[in-house]
Curated annotation (Swiss-Prot):
GO molecular function: structural constituent of ribosome
Subcellular location: Mitochondrion
Intrachain disulfide bonds: none
Name of the molecule in the record: Large ribosomal subunit protein mL63
UniProt keyword annotations, A-Z: Mitochondrion, Ribonucleoprotein, Ribosomal protein
Pfam hit, one: MRP-63
Family: Belongs to the mitochondrion-specific ribosomal protein mL63 family.
Entry superkingdom: Eukaryota
This protein's record includes keyword Mitochondrion: yes
Length: 102
């Protein structure tokens, strides 16, 4: 029994690279270097994104005209899907050909 416990000790159960009790991968120097480079890029992005390009006064309403134009274009595109309005007078105008009293 002690021999079995001694021989089976320290073994990763099941597949050693997947699962809950998997074998941890060794971290190489290249992986550390890539992680440091990614963190530096993220820090620089955070630095630049923390400073606004426009002031609050400039930002207020700067896209109102563009949004209104886009809404009008959307409204026109939706209206283009429907047929044009037809009036009842135009629809029944052919009946006026034989009208004697006018």
């Amino acid at each position: 029994m002690f021999l079995t416990a001694l021989l089976c000790r320290g073994r990763i159960p099941g597949r050693q690279w997947i699962g809950k009790h998997r074998r941890p991968r060794t971290v190489s120097a290249l992986a550390k270097q890539n992680m440091i480079r990614r963190l530096e890029i993220e820090a620089e992005n955070h630095y630049w994104l923390s400073r606004p390009f426009l002031t609050a006064e400039q930002e207020r309403g700067h896209a109102a005209a563009r949004r209104a134009a886009a809404f009008e274009a959307l409204k026109a595109a939706q209206a283009a899907k429907f047929p044009a309005h037809r009036r009842l007078e135009d629809q029944l105008d052919h009946l006026n050909v034989t009208r004697k009293w006018s």
